[in-house]
């Protein structure tokens, strides 16, 4: 069964910024996001023990230099995308979501 995707404003902003600076990376990140519809817990995903998003356990996957942070609502089959962070940025930024 396919999951729906729900994008936070921060994710939209990051995708827009990537579109202005690096179309190739934008495409790679967006394809990784789309793949979460079929498999929200791919083998390269990692559960984030210190982070919840809208009451759900957080996960992350990596695409190139970017970390895609999200949560999964199994009841409604929705992948809730919280942030896209460059690998150089600290996960402490997630405390401000």
Residue ranges and their predicted role:
Residues 13, 35, 86-89:
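Active-site micro-motifs of SAM-dependent methyltransferase domains
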Residues 4, 42, 91:
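Short acidic/His/Gly/Ser-rich catalytic and metal-binding motifs that mark active-site loops
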Residues 1-32:
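Arg/Lys-rich, positively charged N-terminal/basic patches that mediate binding to nucleic acids
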Residues 18, 24, 58-67, 71-97:
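Enriched for short, Lys/Arg-rich terminal
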Residues 34-62:
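A short, surface-exposed loop/turn module that caps and links secondary-structure elements
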Residues 11, 41-44, 72, 84:
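Preference for short coil/turn "hinge" residues that link or interrupt alpha-helices
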